[in-house]
Amino acid sequence: MIVTLTLNPCTDRTVTVDSFHCGETNRAQKVQTDICGKGINVSAVLKNLEQETMCFGFCPKEDKEKLTGFLNHLSIPCEFVETEGGLRVNLKIFDASKGVLTEVNEKGTPVSKAAVSLLLEKAEKVFEKASVLVLSGSVPPGVPSDIYRRLTEKAAKKGIRVILDASGDLLKEGIKGKP
């Protein structure tokens, strides 16, 4: 099974305008809202390719039903550690005349040390089902930059292949785990 990790799930709200004018009122021609996060997106594609997959990570309790309901609708099993707050919102403004997308992404609700510890503990059980682990995306405030390295090391002890898609300090620390 391919287990995907999403530590900072979100709602993408994509607004299409004919021509975006900064500092002015712009009228939306189309609005689309999607539940996502890099790991969730990977699992959705894998499911479409008829691959066995599972989502693992954090789930803000205010939007737990929305997130788990979305995954259940796609028949993707999930194992989440509940955190405070709601899904972060990423605003995407698409200027149709220029074919340009402008993004404004929230950081996410801070996660407690206890939630991080619980995630690392639950990883032991979740990894029993995994042959591949995909670590991808941003992390909310409160999650240490070495989280991907720590999870990679746990996975390696079980012979799980790890794919890392990260940037900045998450990538620098993550590659120390030798994914």
Language-model features, listed with the residues they occupy:
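Conserved beta-alpha-beta core of the PfkB/ribokinase-like small-molecule kinase fold
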Residues: 132-179
